[in-house]
């Protein structure tokens, strides 16, 4: 399936996604985070992502920019569970992944700089089926990440980008992605309804 078809199929599955059953896993999240998760009109990516996982059935997921863990928690609520999720985020005064209070046998949180490859020891990044770039939302950082990680992109991997229209720098990188830089064969702008600040779904 194309990036657009995958995006729309996951949106269709969202119609039967039980958000109420997920809320207990988010019990440590603040009210703002909960409101974002519940908002499917401009911020639907949270409920959409577990449905995307159900559609593509990845074995390995890498998330760059896990923060306090809301996105990770939502991914881990997918009906499909036969995957490992590696999520990395910078140290945040002990707040990193602080919303993740339940135990998930397939969740591997990493605290560190995603530009330091020493954080990925014993992890074969080339086996990643689904990537999510959601770190500092700056042109400089995203370029560095793509230059570093694109060599690990395997054919047909799905790569998602948050906040692609949030500033001129992020827009510039997205424009280059659309032109095929870093090896992408397809792209789909899913800003509406996934995230008002921009959301891109690509395929290698």
Predicted regions: what they are:
Residues 1-40:
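Rossmann-like AdoMet
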Residues 35-204:
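S-adenosylmethionine/decaboxylated-SAM
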């Amino acid at each position: 399936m194309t990036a657009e078809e995958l995006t729309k199929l996951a949106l269709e599955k969202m119609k039967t996604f039980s958000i109420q059953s997920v809320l207990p896993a988010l019990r440590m999240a603040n009210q703002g985070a909960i409101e974002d998760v519940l908002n499917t009109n401009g911020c639907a990516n949270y409920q959409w992502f577990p449905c995307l996982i159900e559609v593509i059935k990845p074995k390995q997921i890498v998330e760059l920019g896990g923060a306090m863990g809301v996105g990770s928690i939502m991914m881990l609520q997918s009906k499909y569970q036969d995957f490992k999720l590696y999520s990395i985020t910078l140290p945040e005064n002990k707040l990193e992944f602080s919303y993740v209070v339940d135990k998930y046998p397939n969740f591997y949180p990493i605290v560190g700089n995603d530009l330091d490859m020493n954080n990925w020891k014993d992890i074969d990044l080339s086996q990643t089926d689904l990537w999510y770039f959601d770190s500092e939302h700056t042109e400089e950082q995203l370029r560095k990440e793509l230059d570093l990680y694109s060599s690990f992109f395997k054919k047909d991997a799905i790569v998602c980008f948050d906040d692609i229209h949030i500033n001129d720098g992020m827009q510039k990188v997205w424009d280059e992605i659309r032109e095929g830089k870093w090896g992408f064969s397809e792209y789909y702008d899913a800003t509406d309804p996934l995230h008002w600040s921009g959301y891109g779904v690509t395929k290698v």
